[in-house]
Structures are given as structure tokens and as C-alpha cells.
Amino acid sequence: MSRRRFLSIGSKLAALSLAPALIRTASAQEGVSSKTVTIGCSSAMSGPLGGFGSAIKVGADAAIGQINAKGGVQGRQIELQMVDDGYVPQRTADNVRKMIDDGSVFALMSCMGTANNAAILPMVEASSLPYLAPFTGASSLRNTGTRNVFHVRASYTDETHRLVQKLLGMGIKDLAVVYLDNAFGKELLADATAAMAVKGVQPVAQAALATDGKNLSEVVAKIMAGKPAAVLLGTAGTASVGLIEALKKASPMMPLVGQSVTLSALDQKNLGAMGSGLALSMVFPDANRAKTPVVRDYQAAMRAIGKDEFSQGSLESYINTRVLAEALERAGRDLTRTKLRTALLSFDKFDLGGFNVDYSKAAPFVGSHYVDLGVLGANGRFIG
């Protein structure tokens, strides 16, 4: 046999032996089979913000159960691949990198945290992995250069400006700000000072709270020294609980206002009566009031999986999953990532039943600017 003939046969055999692996890789890269479509999520299931991650999981499970019970999307069942990152940005990046390298997910949904999302957005863009509903409202992560990221919730800037405007409109100008000592908190501080500056006001005191709350006493002392009329909380997770308790003890009647992520449902439960009177911004309807079809659907889905405690976090995750399912349905049976992006861009005031999502405008793609205000009662639920 000639050398040329030998090499020709050898190369063909090698190609044939590799073909099944290549076919598997091409298929796995999209996280799609004839029967399933797999969605990835990295979130804090443990650590100081573990309550938020648990809510994301429960809300997604409720929506997926409801959708799959009706036949799924285009004949496929939705599967969620959720991995704990403990709210550590490097772990988030490692988790998402593994999903991309393994080719195990078709799209990404609701990864949590400002610094965590900052760590993964470059690889999301580089890999062309569609990413729906980051669980953060940071404006720094919403820029015109992104083409694969579709936000659902309103921004922290939207929330902060609404809160500051409300306080100033009530004649309360001596505002103090406590912010978490990380990227999330520092951005909220910038939003708050910018919103106040518009009205010619600046904080009478500001202090950075460690994510584990270890400097709580110093923070409270610094804030109270400024003699504020109200305190704006740019904090999240268990650190918020200790802060609210300490501020309430220092000045029981002083108004405290926070954002949608200041407290998880578990945090609200742990606060109990100490949380009564706390004002919070809301970027989704009240999860405990079945006034809109989407909230009624959510509550039914939660009950179907044996959950009868409703929360803003699980409602947000439920809505995010419903948005993704609608996009998957619009993308058609012959599913590709490009078709999913095109489907999302077709959302023009899409009404989920009292909550609209719109991606018809230019990037950054932000589906909602809904912001409302609520006040907690002693039972941890919004009053009225």
C-alpha cells in the first residue's frame, strides 16, 4: 500500500472515530435534546444571602412544574441546573465557566449578585450564551455593548430615585445612608447621593457595613452621630437584619427605608415585629396579594409544589422563568440560541397578566421599570 493511500485511509478512520464525539459536543453545547432544554443558574444557596438563592430555586421550580405539567415548551421539558456559589464572585465565574465548557446548558438565568454578575458577563458575551434576568439591578451592568443579556427587573437606580423622591417629597431631608461594603453597596451609595444631589441635598452621614456585619456597632454610632431624620439602607441579606434591629433600638421611631433586595423572605421572618414600619421598594407586584393574574398563577404554582409561603424573591424567579418559557415557545421547535435571542427581542409590552416585559428598544435590554413602595407589617408582609 502506498504511503499516500495509507495516510488517506488513516485520516478518514480518525475522522470517523471522532464523529460521534463531535456530534455529542455540538448537541451538548446547546443543552438541548429532543425531550429537554436545560437552563443554568449560579446563585447563593448558602452564606449571608442564601435566603435569596433559595427563593430563586423555589420560584423557578414552581414555574417549571407548572409549565412542564402543560407539556413544556414546543414539546420539551424545561430542566434547571442550579449550582451554589455562596455569593462569592470567583465561584460564580467558575460555575458558569464549567457550564460553558461542558456545554451542559442552553441558556443562563437569574445568577445573583452585582460583583458575581460582573465576573460572568464577559464570558457570557464571548460565548454567545443567552442570559435572562440577572438577579441584580446594578446599572453598571446595563450597557449598550451587551447583546446576550436580557434584564427583567427595574434597576437599583430606579428604586433609589423613587425612595429618595418619596422621602424628600415628605419633607425629610436629613438622610443618612448605610451601604454594604462591596460593589453592590457602593453602587447604591452613588445612586442615593446622585438622587439627593438633584434636590440640592447630601447625606448627613454615611457608613459602610461589612457583609458579615462585624462592624455593626461602629456603623450605628456613626449614623446616629449625624442625627438623621431617616436612614436609607443600601444593604442586603442577613447583615440587614442586625442593622435594622440596632437602628430600631437606637431610635425606635426613625423611618428606615430599603430596596427590594434589602431583605429576603427568611430575613423578614427572622425580623418579626422589629421589621414593622420598614418601607421597601418593590420591583414586582406584592406576592401575597392575588390582585393580578400573574400573582394568582404564581400562588397556584407554589401550592402545587407544596409551598404556601409567598415572597417577592420567589415571585421574581417565577416571573423570570415564565418570560424565558414564552421566549422558548416563540423560538420554535428547531431551537437555537440565535432564535431565542430573536424571540426575546420580539417582546413588545408582553403582558404576563398584570406585569409587562418589553425588549423592543435598543440595548441594554431592560424588560421592566416597574417600581412600587410598600410598608411591612409585624407579620413580615406588606400592609394594604
Predicted regions and their residues:
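N-terminal export signals
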Residues: R5-A26
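Beta-alpha junction/loop-to-helix N-cap segments that form part of ligand/metal-binding clefts
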Residues: E30-V32, G51-V58, V73-S140, L209-L216, ...
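Extracytoplasmic "Venus flytrap"
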Residues: V32-S33, V37-G59, V83-P89, M112-G113, ...
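Signal peptide-proximal N-terminal region
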Residues: V58-L80, V198-V201
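Extracellular/periplasmic Venus flytrap/periplasmic-binding protein
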Residues: Q90-D94, S139-S140, R147-S251, D286-R296
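Periplasmic-binding protein-like
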Residues: M99, S104-M112, L132-P134, A176-Y179, ...
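Extracellular/periplasmic periplasmic-binding protein-like sensory domains
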Residues: I244-S317, F382
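Segments of small-molecule ligand-sensing domains
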Residues: A304-S314, A325-F382
